[in-house]
């Protein structure tokens, strides 16, 4: 390995955050990238622009033996970008698998990677209790922890304890709701809106906001996956960011009562008054319709791959303000921002180009 070469291990590389990280790292010539996921992927082929720089490993991170066996050759890793997630029905049930996966990765790689410089941990606003109900806004990185269970906090505590006396450092990245491209992902709001709008259009219906009445008027923010990737790599490579947490957001706020009509216009839909309804319930019978739409419009992805209804219900239930203070990242040197409206339109266009939606 050249002294100037950086070797990234992206954990959870098929998710909306992991995909963004991989895409960004491959634009930077000094990086080689190894991707971990349950499904694996296709390595860069000979003669391609990423030849020798991209490879995939399919691994069950909940299995310590499989993790150690599959990762035993990763001796040149310099940076671990951890963005894996396992969904569970309750907050308490989220803790054991999500903590175990991080522990298994670190315990497999750290002892064999002498050049390890940094471990980046992807978190979120659950650290602030945002999922539990109205919380202090803007949320700041210095805010105190809340009553457990909370796997994000347990993961950070593990890294802090593991890092003491070591040469490597860590960072904790805290985005808001992330917008980007990923299939079969349980937390993809842009996919929720795109598929919901496409089905509404196919049925000749206006686009109704389906969340709680109070959620339509509250302040909200999002984080573009590309912006998040840039910030994550910045924090992992800037010494000023060692052992720090950062809120990372697009930099603007919005309310659904202003954004929703703009999204409807992109899909050439009228807007009707909000109507509280569970997407998980009302979209449960729409698979036959989606199959017909796949045939009609030449769409490439089945209903299961594009469905994130439970997460949509979760986000649209926030009848309280949901935003953090992003000034710490700016004070430390990260100044990029993205207009959230433009982010939505770009991602929807990307879905259309890839034949995810009509």
Question: What spans do the regions from the language model cover?
Answer:
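Conserved Rossmann-fold NAD(P)-dependent oxidoreductase catalytic core, especially the SDR/UDP-sugar
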Residues: 78-82, 86, 92-151, 171
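Active-site Tyr-X1-5-Lys
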Residues: 145-176, 181
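N-terminal Rossmann NAD(P)H-binding glycine-rich loop of SDR-like oxidoreductase domains
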Residues: 2-28
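Mid/C-terminal beta-alpha module of Rossmann-like enzyme folds, strongest
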Residues: 229-312, 325-327, 331, 348-355
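Conserved glycine-rich Rossmann-like NAD(P)H-binding loop of the short-chain dehydrogenase/reductase
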Residues: 29-42
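A conserved pocket-lining segment of Rossmann-fold NAD(P)-dependent short-chain dehydrogenase/reductase
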Residues: 195-223
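Glycine/proline-rich active-site loop of Rossmann-fold NAD(P)-dependent oxidoreductases
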Residues: 166, 178-196, 226, 235-246
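Conserved Rossmann-fold cofactor-binding substructure of NAD(P)-dependent oxidoreductases
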Residues: 55-77
């Amino acid at each position: 390995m050249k002294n100037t070469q950086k070797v990234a291990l992206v954990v959870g590389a098929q998710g909306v955050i992991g995909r963004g990280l991989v895409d960004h790292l491959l634009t930077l010539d000094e990086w080689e990238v190894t991707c971990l996921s349950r499904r694996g992927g296709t390595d860069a082929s000979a003669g391609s622009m990423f030849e020798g720089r991209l490879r995939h490993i399919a691994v069950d991170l909940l299995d310590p033996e499989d993790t150690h066996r599959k990762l035993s050759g990763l001796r040149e890793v310099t940076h671990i970008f951890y963005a894996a997630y396992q969904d569970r029905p309750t907050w308490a049930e989220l803790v054991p698998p999500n903590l175990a996966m991080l522990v298994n990765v670190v315990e497999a790689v750290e002892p064999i990677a002498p050049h390890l410089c940094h471990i980046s941990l992807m978190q979120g606003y659950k650290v602030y209790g945002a999922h539990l109900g109205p919380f202090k806004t803007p949320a700041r990185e210095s805010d105190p922890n809340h009553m457990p269970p909370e796997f994000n906090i347990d993961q950070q505590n593990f890294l802090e304890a593991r890092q003491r006396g070591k040469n490597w450092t860590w960072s904790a990245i805290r985005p808001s709701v992330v917008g980007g491209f990923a299939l079969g992902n349980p937390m993809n709001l842009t996919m929720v809106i795109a598929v919901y709008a496409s089905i509404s259009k196919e049925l000749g219906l206006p686009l109704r906001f389906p969340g709680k009445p109070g959620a339509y008027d509250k302040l909200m923010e999002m984080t573009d996956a590309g912006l998040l990737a840039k910030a994550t790599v910045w924090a992992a490579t800037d010494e000023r960011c060692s052992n720090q947490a950062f809120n990372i957001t697009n930099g603007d706020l919005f309310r659904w009562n202003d954004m929703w009509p703009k999204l409807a216009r992109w899909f050439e839909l009228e807007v009707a008054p909000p109507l509280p309804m569970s997407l998980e319930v009302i979209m449960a019978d729409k698979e036959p319709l989606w199959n017909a739409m796949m045939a009609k419009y030449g769409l490439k992805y089945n209903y299961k791959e594009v469905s994130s209804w439970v997460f949509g219900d979760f986000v649209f239930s926030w009848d309280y303000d949901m935003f953090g203070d992003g000034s710490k990242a700016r004070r430390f040197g990260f100044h990029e921002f993205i207009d959230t409206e433009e982010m939505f339109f770009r991602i929807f266009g990307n879905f259309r180009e890839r034949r995810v939606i009509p």
